[in-house]
Amino acid sequence: MLGEFQEQIQRRRDLNEASRRLAGLLGEHGFAPQGGTSLFQWVVSMRAHALRDHLARQGILVRLFETPGSLRFGLPPDEKGWERLEHGLRTFNQMESLR
């Protein structure tokens, strides 16, 4: 029983660390979160629709909210997911800078 409790504590720590990593990654690419939990980060952006569409074309699903225009990003499932998200954010910003 004590082992299960310690596992729960470690899992919470891991989720909190992953959430901070997600917030940092989003912020590095110009999408600083306005809120979140240990499971997701919420970003308000005038470019929410365009970013959602760009990420969806790469198989990265985020939740779009209309008012205010915002996105909810869940934690990537594994390291490959983190890499895909970083690539998606980077290529979106590159594409936007060409406009």
Where are these regions (language model features)?
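A general structural signal for well-ordered alpha-helical segments in protein cores
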Residues: S19, A48, W82-L85
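Structural signature of PLP-dependent enzymes
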Residues: M1-G24
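Short coil/turn linker and secondary-structure boundary residues
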Residues: G3, M46, P77-K80
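Conserved PLP-binding catalytic core of the aspartate aminotransferase-like
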Residues: N16, G24-Q58, L75
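Short, histidine-centered active-site or binding-site loop motifs used for metal coordination
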Residues: E4, T37, E66
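Internal amphipathic alpha-helical segments of the cytochrome P450 catalytic fold
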Residues: Q8-R12, R52, W82
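PLP-dependent enzyme catalytic core of the Aspartate aminotransferase-like
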Residues: H54-Q58, L64-R99
